Regions:
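Acidic helix/loop microenvironments that form the catalytic cleft of cell-wall polysaccharide enzymes
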Residues: 103-111, 557-565, 750-751
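Sequence context surrounding c-type heme c attachment/ligation sites in exported
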Residues: 13, 17, 38-145, 403, ...
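Gly-Asp-aromatic-enriched flexible segments
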Residues: 148-149, 153-421, 425
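A structural supersecondary motif
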Residues: 645-648, 656-666
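Globin-like tetrapyrrole-binding proteins
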Residues: 747
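Primarily short, surface-exposed interaction patches in extracytoplasmic proteins
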Residues: 1-32, 38-40, 95-96, 142-170, ...
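Residues that flank catalytic or metal-binding motifs in active/ligand-binding sites
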Residues: 12, 45-46, 101, 225-227, ...
């Protein structure tokens, strides 16, 4: 009930068209579609006929008995003109088909395995059938597999090294972890912090680090949080100037000639190509470096910054995103979706999930995963730590807290650097695995005879019925009980005289609008009697004798006197044959929905006669379709209508409008309706207007109007226009308000919307 795409169904569709175009003997076509996997390697694709059967319910595995019923019903109606499915609950009321016959066939089909289309409770498609033999698959996969194995070993080695580094960090002496300050951030608030105001004296050595951690608060989730972290080597501040525009100048500002490292400078790092490289980042504001370098003994002032998840065993944020919230100016490092550190690198605020201030750095913890900004000291000396933490998404109603800590283990900074180096060590990318061509198909499954379902209820089981053929048609047992029996079923159906009669009748129906038997799915006692039984038998016998050639059958029918008659009937004919069952004249019929659409495209010159392959479905890994949100799509194409994507639950709009087949059941006879919405289609539909415009553009602008009219009639209606018809069309073009090409397009639309275009007579 989620109506999921069947990605590989195109292979079966193309197989059918190719078989028809090659005039494959029809009995072979039938055998291939039932048991092709046991006949030839190419025959696997043909078994898509069975695999594509309708699935039922929420958990389709629980309702497979309904799928088997659909298969049995379709096999019986399509090839034999028998309503075998009526015997599911009890013996057929009208035809000599028993419930035991039904469950004998049921066992054959239930002993096979079918590709799984996926369903809401059981996930994505599976059990596709490879179209290569194992040796071919091994040859194709071997070079890639060798690379993949090397990549796996390298990844395992990387993870082992990272595990040792995380273990070291998790086992650091708690005494080396000194809290500088911590606070909550109220909704919508900005909380400044300063180690001097907290009367904290911080003396750092190279390799020690200062860590700002933002954590989810209480039972709340997480929030986007703007942060600033400034590490200042302590110096004088005689002129009270502020090196950071975000902090108001006051007694706590530092001398602009002193050295400080600000997280604000990291925003520039996000904006550059170095953003593509995982830390350490060396960006820092080094105002007055020469002076301070001398004061600090000429120490290297390049500090490293890291972004980490701050659980007991810290983990660096390693996933790079160059766009967030649909905005390329929002760039981030993360683990999964969260936690993350991100920046708005634009000079303007970014309106995404909230308004993010320009040129600012943000942290976003996960619901249970704090996130940290780590500064590793390059110097030995006293520092002051200050900055702010601000709720950047007030409307979210989530809360955060933050803490600033000094970690005194000098080697820990080296461990961060080692972790970054490990993560940046290239691992051979084996690339995508070779694509093994697969079919949505049928293969042998678990072999077993079926029990009768009493009154059709799979919970109430009766006697076991051995797999065999229908009793009235011979009742032959299986030659090999260890196999499913599909190969025998294929032979039984393809070799039975009913199969030839049913197919001949269908081809006749395609040409005349109705078959010699007007119930093409039912040749049983409740079906219609043939209007010309001798003709049906003669054509069936010739069909078999020709080697089941469909093309030869078309030639015989189209060369008959009946096919070449006019659809006009005399009064005597109407009196003698009012329903035209004896074919006293050709039965006028409307084109099918597919024929109408294909004719429109053929007239415009836009008909794409190629088969095509799969439709542009979303990747299966992204499917989240449910019974409340099933898959639904309409893919535009100029290919023949038989190549369009068809869904079970929703018909293509054009096919639905013009009485296309029901995708859920065999449709032996198309209904023909004439409704206002069909006229509205020709007035308003963009596709129809585009095709008419394409024809108009092919008309020679220098050709006189009457010649244009004759060209149009020949192209669209395959005949010349009468003088009156030509004049009427010229009058329409003359009266039309608009460009000449638009006027001719309007005239073309009128011809293609006419009854003459839609009917064969």
């Amino acid at each position: 009930n989620t109506d999921r795409p069947v990605v590989n169904a195109w292979r079966y569709r193309n197989w059918v068209f190719d078989a028809m175009n090659r005039d494959m003997p029809f009995d072979a076509m039938v055998r291939h579609q039932i048991a092709g996997d046991q006949e030839t390697p190419e025959g696997i694709v043909a078994t898509g006929y069975l695999a594509i059967a309708r699935r039922f319910g929420h958990d389709i595995d629980k309702d497979m008995y309904l799928t088997y019923e659909e298969m049995i019903d379709n096999l019986g109606k399509s090839f034999l003109g028998l309503t075998i499915g009526c015997a599911r609950c009890h013996d057929h009321k009208y035809d000599p088909v028993s419930a035991e016959d039904y469950y004998a066939l049921y066992g054959i089909l239930a002993s096979s395995k079918y590709s799984f289309p996926g369903c809401e409770p059981k996930g994505q498609p599976k059990d596709m059938v490879p179209l290569l033999v194992p040796s071919q698959i091994e040859t194709l996969r071997k070079p890639w597999q060798e690379k993949a194995d090397l990549a796996k070993q390298a990844k395992e080695s990387q993870q082992a090294s990272l595990g040792q580094a995380r273990k070291y960090l998790s086992e650091l002496d708690p005494a080396d972890r000194v809290a500088i300050l911590q606070a909550d951030v109220p909704e919508g608030a900005k909380v400044p912090f300063d180690s001097q105001e907290a009367s904290k004296t911080i003396f750092v050595r190279p390799g020690e680090w200062i860590q700002l951690t933002v954590s989810p608060k209480g039972n709340h989730g997480a929030d986007s949080t703007m942060v600033q972290l400034v590490i200042q080597a302590i110096g004088s501040n005689p002129n009270k100037e502020n090196p950071n525009s975000d902090l108001a100048a006051n007694d706590n500002t530092v001398d602009k000639k002193s050295v400080f490292w600000s997280s604000d400078a990291l925003v520039n790092d996000f904006a550059t190509t170095s953003f593509q490289k995982l830390g350490p980042t060396n960006q820092a504001d080094l105002g007055g470096q020469d002076l301070v370098s001398q004061d600090l003994g000429g120490q290297d002032l390049k500090a490293s910054w890291y972004y980490a998840e701050s659980t007991k065993s810290p983990e660096l944020l390693v996933e790079l995103r160059t766009s967030n919230g649909g905005n390329a100016n929002i760039r981030s490092w993360s683990i999964g979706e969260l936690p993350s550190v991100f920046a708005n690198v634009s000079d303007s605020p970014a309106n995404v999930w909230t308004s993010l201030a320009a040129k600012s750095l943000f942290m976003h913890p996960g619901p249970e995963r704090p996130v940290s900004l780590v500064w590793v000291s390059p110097i030995e000396g006293q520092v002051r730590v200050h900055g702010f933490v601000q709720d950047a998404h007030p409307a979210a109603l989530d809360g955060v807290s933050f803490s600033v800590e000094h970690w005194k283990a000098p080697k820990a900074g080296e461990v961060f650097e080692q972790m970054a180096a490990i993560l940046q060590t290239p691992i051979l990318d084996p690339g995508p695995a070779p694509v093994i061509p697969e079919a949505y198909a049928t293969v042998e499954g678990t072999i077993a005879d079926a029990r009768v379902h009493l009154r059709g209820d799979p919970e109430k089981l009766g006697e076991i019925v051995p797999r065999r053929w229908i009793e009235i048609l011979g009742g032959d047992p299986l030659k090999d009980p260890k196999a499913s029996g599909r190969i025998e079923l294929a032979d039984w159906i393809a070799g039975h005289p009913l199969m030839a009669r049913v197919m001949v009748n269908r081809v006749w129906q395609w040409h005349f609008g109705q078959g010699l038997v007007r119930t093409p799915n039912d040749f049983g006692s409740r079906g219609d009697q043939p209007s010309h039984p001798e003709l049906l038998d003669q054509l069936a016998a010739q069909f078999v004798k020709s080697g089941y050639s469909i093309k030869q059958l078309h030639r015989w029918i189209m060369n008959t006197d009946a096919y070449r008659r006019s659809s006009s009937a005399t009064a005597e004919q109407m009196l003698a044959d009012p329903e035209n069952r004896l074919l006293s004249h050709y039965p006028r019929r409307r084109l099918t929905a597919e024929e109408i659409r294909d004719s429109i495209l053929a007239c415009s010159g836009n008909l794409d006669r190629s088969y095509g392959q799969e439709h542009p479905f979303p990747a299966p890994a992204t499917w989240t379709f449910s019974q409340h949100d099933p898959f639904n799509a309409v893919y535009a194409t100029n290919r023949r209508s038989a190549m369009m994507m068809v869904q079970r639950q929703r018909r293509h709009p054009f096919l639905a409008l013009f009485d296309g087949a029901d995708p859920n059941a065999s449709t032996p006879v198309r209904q023909t309706s004439s409704v206002p919405t069909q006229a509205l289609y020709y007035l308003n539909d963009p596709f129809f207007h585009e095709q008419a415009a394409a024809i108009a553009k092919t008309l020679d602008a220098n050709e006189p109007g009457p010649a244009k009219v004759q060209s149009m009639y020949q192209q669209i209606l395959q005949r010349p226009a009468s003088d009156a018809q030509a004049q009427a069309l010229l009058d329409l073009v003359e009266r039309y308000e608009g460009a000449p090409v638009d006027a001719w397009a309007a005239a073309i639309r009128m011809l293609m919307a006419s009854n003459e275009f839609h009917f064969i007579d």
